[in-house]
Amino acid sequence: MLLVSKLLTLFVYPLSFFFTLVIVSIVLRRRLASRLANALRLLAVAWLYFCATEWGASLLLAPLERGYPAVETDALPLAEAIVVLGGGMTDESRFGLGGDLNAAADRLWHSAALFSAGKAPIMVLSGGAGLGQSTTEAELMLGALRAIGIDGAIELETQSQTTRENAYFTGKLLNAHGITHILLVTSAAHMRRAIPLFQAQGLLVTPAATDHQTPLHVGAIPGWLPTTERLGRSTRALHEWVGYWIYERLGYFEMAAITEN
């Protein structure tokens, strides 16, 4: 099911959608539907261009992040636990020193700062092993935190492979400890989907958003020029919008339990 859902999600990504429309237009052209084929090609090019510009990337991503601004560590309340969602590491490493960090590694550093500041007495690292991975992301995150000197009570949730499972399995762990109030650490764009899933587990959630990707300033490259970085942000935003829509339609924000294999 995980593989199927990820493959289906790929079709909404700008590049995948572009090539899908191009392939459909080629088929239509061979069937003498040239006018429709040309329209699809124009739509494909326009959509890819839009998503690769600052206009498109900001229009798609900013609404996801706007509700979860960066908050100074001192301004966040005390909680019973800090919950960190996986997504910032992979188990690939060229040097045999553990997982490699990726673009979402801010989750790890932000959680380390919160824990060091005493915002909660316990931290929960949530993330199982992805497709083709031999080590769970929770274990990789623990290794990275220990390497930078973060000690103390850290619990691991190693079964989850989706955001929904993050919430469910972490919720079970927290309920066993009698914990109800958490600081949730994940990327700002991910918060819209993650928070209601944890609330469905009966938890009081305070967002501790990080990894904001909407730039404060456009920079040297004009906003109308397409770049791969902007295309990447649009892709991330579409992933979250579609994920939120699917979870909402399936009732995941209201359902506390899932079927365990």
Residue ranges and their predicted role:
Residues 50-228, 234-235:
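A structural signal for short, hydrophobic/glycine-enriched beta-strand patches
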Residues 12-17, 204, 231, 244:
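Alpha-helical transmembrane anchor segments
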Residues 3-8, 56, 60-64, 238-245:
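Hydrophobic alpha-helical segments of integral membrane proteins
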Residues 220-221, 232-261:
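Extracytoplasmic/luminal low-complexity segments enriched in Pro/Gly and acidic/polar residues
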Residues 1-27:
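Membrane-embedded alpha-helical segments of integral membrane proteins
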Residues 39-54:
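Hydrophobic membrane-insertion alpha-helices, especially the h-region
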Residues 29-37:
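Membrane-interface helix-boundary motifs at transmembrane edges
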